[in-house]
Amino acid sequence: MSGKLIQRLQDPSRSGAYRVSRVEEVEDAVRGSSLCLVRVAFAHKAVLLNNLASALGFPDWFGHNWDALEDCLTDLSWRDAPGYVLLIESPRPGDDLGILIDILRSSAEFWAGRGKPFFALFVDPARALPLPELFRQS
C-alpha cells in the first residue's frame, strides 16, 4: 500500500483535501520521501492556526487569521519542499472547519497549478466529514 500511496501523494494532479483513518500508513509512506509532512491538532481555530504556524515555520508577519493562513499556505518560500502533506487531527464539524477546508482546497489548487503536490488529510476514523477518502479501507 505504501508504494501506491506515496505515488498518489507525489502526484500534483491529485492534490486536495481528503479524509483518512490510517495515519500510520500515511506517515510510513511519506517517511523517506522529500515531501514536507506536518501533523497538527484542530481543537479550535486559534489552536489550529498556532499549530500550523509552528509546524510550518510561518514568518513573523503571520496574522493568525484565515486570510493570513491562506497567504502563508500559498507562499511557503521559507519551507520549500517538493510537496506538502498536512495531517489534521481532531477536526470538529462547524463553520471553522468549513472555512479551513475551503482554504486548504484553494491552497492545493494553487500548488497543483505549479506542479507541487499539496494534500490536506483530515484524520476521520468515523468517516463523518464530507470529504473523499484518500484511499479505500481494506
Summary of predicted features, one role per range:
Residues 1-56, 60, 76-138:
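N-terminal intrinsically disordered, low-complexity segments enriched in P/E/S/T
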Residues 61-65:
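Alpha-helical transmembrane segments with an aromatic anchor "belt"
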